[in-house]
A protein has these predicted regions:
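Alpha-helical coupling/stalk and coiled-coil linker elements that connect catalytic or binding modules
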Residues: 1-432, 439-469, 491-492
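ATPase nucleotide-binding head domains, primarily ABC-like/P-loop NTPase cores
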Residues: 72-73, 257, 376, 382-604
């Protein structure tokens, strides 16, 4: 636990250091605000005082202070962003400290990914409140969240792919600063989750203005005519009123295009603000040395023709920000009259899109994938006692020592092992209510899933063969589908049989099969199902209250092993060790608990 304490200390130190930086940022904002006020008042006063003393005095005492005022506005904006950045940095480190104590309510739980018909995610509480996803999720981009969820929904089944992902996660787990920078940049974006999808749609949409030659002429022609008129007016060849009339005419002419440009800006202008976030995240990644196969490959995706991806994305961000100046009526009127500013900017934006149409979606996907890797890397960093399991090449193999459930308190969790070293092979677990059977099944399932997505697991040692995971732990009635509990369970078992008949390699975890029928029917069906699994050459774990299932070991002595979780009654008190033992359970606790609660139990 010493390493865990060091990690807690690291987060605390980051908070302390950042709080000092935040104090400094607030002081700078205060002094800049004060200086801006002084300069503005001074510039206005000097303009009034020196108005009649000519342009030289006016420039020296009024215009120059005003220029300095504008520069201070930019510095003010920088320090405001810096303040928000530092506040968010403190916040995410405080969140990590709470998460270390199993309070991870601050993180997105991915409830939109809950799927009752999924092969294992509902049974293992992968998504939703207090879920595995919520515990691990640190994504700060919508695409990153989608990537992370997809990895949980469809785990890897290839040894090399898992090992490559392990390398990437391990590499990022050693770089706390990079991970937090990526997260902070994403969290500071104030847009909506759908924006990235719409940006992709925009990137793939056809250009309108740039493809029409007649629309490309006005910006150049208007600029030439305007400056020619201004030059002729200065030389006295034409009157200033003619030059002014030409200018006004062009202002009116530019309004023809305003409706279409306004539609473009309304649809995409605010959404494209996220590009500055992606530009910063891309730049951060471009500057980072990558060692693992996956991260090197992702970094090569952040490329462009004649410039870096970060430069290209920042260029588009600047073009969109420049177009936003049209919201200032005075500036847009002057620029449209002089150089057809709005149309010129839209044509530049469409030119950018034509060059990078295929690049932008790829860059966004790449940053999203890195964002997802950072979540798993933070999970690895926060659990230094977790290990990366060995991935077996030959089917089927699952061995682990001291497995623990990641969501259980590390100081209270009783850890157990598992050993499946051949195919077919089933572990049958018996035991009393509340003795720990279901928790054990979920512990095995969750760690198996983590291993198959490349993440570290809570075990002293683990070796797995990555067959597809299928569970049936939490079947329920469906009123909407007019489906009984028993029929829902049968459908699940039929799904498993169909997959096995199709030749899929599965690792199956079942809890109390055929719960929706009478005892004799259930027992007969359970015997038949396990025998069918044996003949179909598959592997798994089954938990049951039916002690007679333990006799199957007599028929399959090399392929079935019995384990149990016992409830011990000592001094008229029920106790649980939660330690898995060999053999079939000997003690049951239902009648004992009923008596303790005052419910009459009639003995034969």
């Amino acid at each position: 636990m010493e390493k865990q304490e060091q990690i807690i200390t690291t987060y605390q130190q980051i908070i302390q250091k950042t709080e000092l930086e935040l104090q400094n940022a607030r002081k700078r904002i205060y002094y800049i605000s004060l200086l801006r006020l002084i300069l503005f008042v001074g510039a206005v006063a000097n303009a009034i005082i020196f108005w009649s003393d000519g342009w030289l005095c006016l420039s020296a005492f009024a215009i120059l202070p005003f220029i300095l005022f504008i520069w201070l506005v930019k510095r003010h904006n920088f320090w405001f962003y810096r303040k928000d950045f530092l506040k968010k940095k403190i916040e995410i480190n405080e969140q990590e400290l709470r998460a270390m104590q199993y309070d991870f309510s601050d993180f997105d739980d991915g409830k939109e990914f809950v799927n009752p018909s999924h092969l294992y995610t509902l049974d293992l509480d992968v998504f939703g409140e207090h879920s595995l996803f919520q515990y691990i999720n640190r994504t700060a981009t919508p695409i990153g969240k989608q990537h992370l969820a997809s990895w949980f929904n469809a785990h890897l089944e290839n040894k090399e792919a898992i090992e490559h992902r392990q390398e990437a996660i391990h590499e990022l787990s050693t770089d706390l600063e990079y991970r937090q920078q990526i997260r902070l940049l994403g969290l500071l974006y104030k847009g909506k989750p759908a924006d990235t999808t719409e940006i992709k749609e925009w990137a793939n949409s056809p250009s309108y203005y740039r493809k029409r030659t007649l629309l490309r002429i006005p910006p150049t022609a208007v600029t030439i005519i305007n400056f020619l008129c201004i030059g002729l007016a200065i030389l006295g060849i034409i009157s200033a009123s003619i030059a002014g009339g030409v200018f006004v005419g062009f202002v009116l002419f530019s309004t023809i295009f305003s409706k279409g440009i306004t539609k473009l800006q309304t649809t995409y202008g605010e959404k494209l603000q996220i590009l500055s976030t992606y530009a910063d995240q891309i730049l951060l990644t471009e500057q980072k040395e990558m060692q693992s196969h996956i991260l090197q490959k992702l970094k090569t995706e952040l490329t462009s023709q004649n410039q870096t991806a970060s430069q290209a994305v920042r260029q588009l961000s600047k073009l969109m920000n420049a177009l936003d100046q049209r919201s200032n009526l005075l500036i847009s009127t002057i620029l449209n009259g002089l150089i057809f500013w709005e149309l010129r900017q839209v044509i530049r934006i469409e030119k950018w899109k034509e060059i990078h149409a295929s690049d932008l979606p790829r860059w966004i996907e790449t940053i999203g994938e890195i964002d997802a890797y950072c979540s798993l890397a933070t999970f690895a960093y926060n659990h230094p006692d977790y290990i990366y399991p060995t991935i077996a090449a030959q089917s089927f193999h699952l061995q682990a020592e001291a497995l623990g459930h990641p969501l259980m308190d590390r100081n209270k969790c009783v850890r157990n092992g598992i050993d499946i070293e051949r195919r077919p092979f089933f572990i049958i677990i018996t035991g009393a209510n509340m003795a720990g059977k279901s928790t054990y099944l979920r512990t095995v399932g969750v760690n198996y899933l983590l291993a198959c997505i490349g993440a570290p697991v809570w075990a002293k040692r683990m070796e797995i063969y990555p067959a597809r995971l299928v569970t049936s732990l939490r079947t329920s009635d469906s009123l909407a589908d007019n489906e009984s509990y028993f029929f829902a369970e049968l459908k699940r078992l039929k799904l498993i049989i169909d997959k096995l008949e199709a030749g899929e390699e599965l690792f199956i975890i079942l809890d109390e099969i055929l719960k929706g029928t009478n005892s004799m029917d259930k027992q007969k069906g359970s015997f038949a199902l396990i025998k069918q699994f044996m003949h179909m050459n598959t592997n798994g774990i089954i938990a049951t209250h039916d002690l007679l299932l333990g006799t199957l070991v007599d028929s399959f002595p090399q392929n079935i092993r019995n384990y149990c979780f016992e409830a011990d009654i000592t001094n008229n008190e029920l106790t649980f060790s939660y330690q898995m033992r060999n053999g079939v359970a000997q003690n049951m606790n239902a009648c004992f608990l009923m008596k303790k609660m005052g419910i009459a139990v009639i003995n034969d």
